[in-house]
């Protein structure tokens, strides 16, 4: 799966590790990884105490490079949208998700993230009662999700998409 703007989320944890790829946007990810990638796959691993660790790091480096190529290609292959997403963090995440799905990326799960619900004041405005931080956040989510669903429908992909909203709030 792909997770946006937050790492180590519960939905992608296994007993051994986190199985998701963290993504802010495909272009930035691709530029960072390809700009720093050093192809050392064919170089011999030294027979030292750190040899296994070096082999692991090289494999992770290569896999990051390979995945960034695939993600970037999907983002670039997507048709241009005629819809306007809200210019918000969650709106941008929905827009990127739509691009990746439309571009043919076969990732089965996308985990978007909207922060800001941990409020202690101004959660609901005093007058009128439909203002405040909570209302603004839910409105942003609703507007962004609406555009995403309209785009999936326009692309003939709506029957392949299931949207679930969850909330995790707790004190440990």
Report each predicted region and the residues it spans.
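Feature for exported/extracytoplasmic and membrane-associated proteins, marking the mature portion
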Residues: 1-143, 147-154
């Amino acid at each position: 799966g792909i997770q946006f703007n937050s790492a180590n989320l519960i939905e992608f944890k296994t007993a051994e590790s986190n199985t998701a790829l963290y993504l802010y946007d495909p272009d930035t990810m691709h530029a960072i990884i390809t700009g720093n990638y050093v192809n050392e796959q064919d170089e011999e691993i030294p027979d030292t105490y750190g040899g296994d660790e070096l082999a692991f790091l090289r494999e992770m480096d290569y896999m990051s490079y390979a995945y960034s190529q695939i993600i970037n290609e999907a983002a670039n292959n997507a048709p241009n949208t005629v819809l306007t997403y809200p210019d918000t963090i969650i709106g941008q995440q929905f827009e990127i998700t739509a691009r990746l799905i439309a571009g043919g990326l076969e990732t089965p799960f996308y985990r978007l993230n909207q922060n800001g619900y941990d409020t202690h004041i101004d959660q609901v405005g005093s007058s009128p009662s439909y203002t405040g931080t909570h209302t603004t956040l839910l409105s942003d989510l609703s507007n962004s999700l609406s555009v995403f669903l309209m785009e999936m429908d326009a692309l003939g992909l709506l029957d392949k998409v299931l949207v679930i909203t969850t909330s995790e709030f707790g004190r440990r």
